[in-house]
Amino acid sequence: HQISTDEVYGSIPLDDNVTRFDENSTLRPSSPYSASKASADMLVMSYYRTYKLPVTISRCSNNYGPYQHPEKLIPLTIRRLLHGEDLLIHGDGLDMRDWLYVIDHCKAVDTIIHSDIVGEIYNISANNEISNINIMKKISSHMNTISSIVHIENRPCHDTKYTLDSSKISYRLGHNMECNFEETFANT
């Protein structure tokens, strides 16, 4: 099973509240990281088509939860707040991300792996779309701590928004996300 990313589809304009990438959307990676993931997806599918290797691919949105890598947005924000440091945000902070609780992600991958269906791609999303700056404010509020938010230069090729249509995993495999963002956010 290949675990991929929503970044392989490229970015959606912030003001587009309609578009959701489905599994048939064109791959338009905009960074070396996302291009490497898109390339891996294509390589995996080529082995399925050529050799009938039983493969599946999942493309997920941003994960959050306990034990997340410390350089990621949520744990980094928590750590900076605990140390009384300024919060650093790229650009205007309005970039939108869909947040998927890690337990939901693991359960979805488990469902895919244990299904009899091969050669398929599944998007995994919880439809918890929140701007980066609002995530920082939510964490600050939850921790009852205030720090200055300092805007820094955006990273090159920084995508503005990813939104996935994950209905296929629901109707094909009967899997639905179970975790509520507000409840699980506190566990992070």
Which stretches of residues belong to each language-model region?
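C-terminal substrate-binding subdomain of Rossmann-fold SDR/epimerase-dehydratase oxidoreductases
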Residues: L81-T188
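Short-chain dehydrogenase/reductase
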Residues: T19, S25, P29-A38, Q68-K72, ...
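A conserved pocket-lining segment of Rossmann-fold NAD(P)-dependent short-chain dehydrogenase/reductase
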Residues: E23-R28, L53-P66, T77-L100, N123-S125
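Conserved Rossmann-fold NAD(P)-dependent oxidoreductase catalytic core, especially the SDR/UDP-sugar
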Residues: H1-S30
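Active-site proximal helix/loop that lines the substrate pocket
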Residues: T5-G10, N62-Q68, L94, H114, ...
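Aromatic/hydrophobic pocket-lining residues that form π-stacking "cages" and hydrophobic walls in ligand
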Residues: V44, T77, M136
